[in-house]
From Swiss-Prot:
Enzyme Commission no: 1.-.-.-
Positions of region (Disordered): 1-26, 153-261, 278-303
GO molecular function annotations of the record: oxidoreductase activity
Enzyme class: oxidoreductase
Modified sites of kind Phosphoserine: S181
Primary localization: cytoplasm
Cellular location(s): Cytoplasm
Record's protein name: Putative monooxygenase p33MONOX
Taxonomy of the source species: Eukaryota, Metazoa, Chordata, Craniata, Vertebrata
CC terms in the record's Gene Ontology section: cytoplasm
Length: 317
């Protein structure tokens, strides 16, 4: 087989000749050569490559095999060949700027989101009129740098609106449960009042046992502070409450049933017990120690008889 200058050497030389690399064997139809375009190999069986395929050709125009669409191109040319040639000539000399698609898409997406944010800013009235741009930045760029500030403003405005919607004078008299008390506790990232409120709540909670219970169940008792200064209850914590203290804005009545002892009281009671009878705590270990020793003395000696040795010796002896 004579190879033309543009061809790649075929592995199979033909059915009749045995000069090929593999003799009479040919490559199975499913395997494709590296240099051929896949469109041709899908339709026709394996054959030596046509003369117009070259390695340099493949690099320059790999997308469309021209032989396949030659007939279509001829028909188009017969209809309006002049228009086609003119359009081809006009499109060829345009310079091509190469860029990664991912970077282009990223910049497009960023720009689009920023523009939509600015639209929203204008609608919500968040734009800063007295804003002066940085020396090194254009006015276009400074709009994008203000996005974080505008988002922060938006959050602050929304929280303010929520707080205004909840009127503080819903109830003129306090309700029985602390959950429905009129002052709403404001929660936010930027509020630094929570720590001070909890401090005052813990200070106030030491006045009476009922308020201790409230503080443990509800948290800081800062929400009861709407009704004026809190009345000081001059009763000891162990006293069962006999009369309600009605001098303040609402009745403070201590719980008459069984009250939880505070941890300090528990510690004091334990200390007094220890002082009264120290033998109670030291007696159990003293009682246990001799019995344990007695048991150990009983179980310690092992006297093996001669008849028991056959259990301990291996069977081969």
């Amino acid at each position: 087989m004579v190879s033309r200058p543009g061809d790649l050497p075929a592995l199979e030389a033909g059915p009749g000749s045995s000069e090929g690399l593999l003799g009479g064997m040919s490559i199975p139809a499913g395997m494709t050569r590296r240099a051929l375009s896949y469109d041709d190999n899908l339709e026709r069986p394996m054959s030596p490559p046509p003369s117009d395929i070259n390695i340099s050709n493949l690099w320059k125009r790999p997308v469309i095999p021209e032989r396949k669409f030659a007939r279509l191109a001829e028909e188009d040319e017969s209809e309006g060949g002049v228009k086609q040639s003119a359009s081809f000539e006009s499109t060829k000399p345009i310079p091509v700027v190469k860029a990664k698609a991912s970077s282009v898409m990223n910049s497009l997406i960023i720009k689009q989101t920023q523009e939509s944010m600015q639209k929203f800013e204008k609608q919500a009235g968040l734009t800063d009129t007295g804003y002066t741009p940085h020396k090194g930045l254009n006015a276009e760029e400074t709009r994008y740098h203000r996005l974080a500030e505008s988002m922060h403003k938006l959050q602050m405005q929304s929280t303010d609106a929520k707080e205004e919607r909840q009127p503080s004078s819903n109830q003129s008299t306090p309700a029985g449960t602390p959950q429905s008390s009129p002052k709403q506790k404001r929660r936010g990232w930027f509020n630094s009042q929570g720590s001070t409120a909890s401090l005052t709540g813990s200070e106030m909670s030491t006045s009476s046992s009922s308020s201790v219970d409230l503080a443990s169940a509800e948290g800081p008792i800062e929400r009861w502070g709407v009704f004026g200064p809190r009345p000081q209850v001059s009763k000891s914590t162990t006293d069962p409450g006999t009369h309600p203290d009605t001098s303040g804005g609402f009745a403070l009545q201590s719980y008459k049933g069984a009250q939880k002892p505070t941890p300090m009281e528990v510690m004091k009671a334990q200390a007094t017990r220890l002082a009264e009878d120290p033998t109670n705590f030291k007696a159990p270990p003293k009682m246990e120690i001799p019995t344990m020793d007695g048991k150990r003395q009983v179980t310690r000696p092992h006297k093996l008889k001669h008849r028991d040795m056959n259990v301990l010796t291996p069977s081969g002896f």
